[in-house]
Amino acid sequence: MKPVLTGANMRPNDVDRLMQAARVSDPLDLVSPYQFNHALAPHIAATRDGVPIDIQHIKIAFDTLHARHDVLLVEGIGGIMVPITKDFFVLDLIALLGLSALVVTRGDIGTINHSIMTVKLLQSHEVPVAGLVLNYQNTTQAHPPEDLGWPEILRSTEVDSRGVLPHISNLEEAWDEGMEYLSQRLITDDLFPVH
């Protein structure tokens, strides 16, 4: 599930990839109840399009999908302090849905501050943190994890590493290979226990 998709007109978009990876064919309006073409924060995109976001509508879609599947992965929308509505943030949605968080950090300078603040804020709101992933999404591995402070991040947050994802320059062509890589390195039985 991706509760709000911005940049919906880009192909493939996050929801396309999410549904392909999960191998599901649930209705699009359940997987992503709100979709906006503007690649902006949800509240800003919704305001620009004149479409108010109803958090209860997202909750109903979540509950419906949760009842259909043994495991439900909910992809975030930017960082945890990105506004979904004027006064309701991604962090609030995580707490409302009773989710654990897998924090994916960027493989670049500044990740110490960003990662520790994100984890500490989640913890202060009693959101369980299932692990940290260092992702070299937009860059080659110019700085090794040690130079980015990866060990310090793990020590300071007391959260387990779930892996380091290398930059893949030909992601479109290597999608299946990348999914295999992820399934072998990130997903473990203890990551998201089934309740």
Predicted region positions:
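Inter-motif core of Ras-like GTPase G domains
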Residues: 85-108
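A general structural detector for well-ordered alpha-helical segments in enzyme core domains, enriched
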Residues: 14, 58-61, 90-93, 118, ...
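Short internal beta-strands
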Residues: 2, 102-105, 130-136
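Phosphate-binding/switch loop-helix module in NTP-utilizing enzymes
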Residues: 42-84, 91
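P-loop NTP-binding module
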Residues: 63-76, 98-101, 183-190, 195
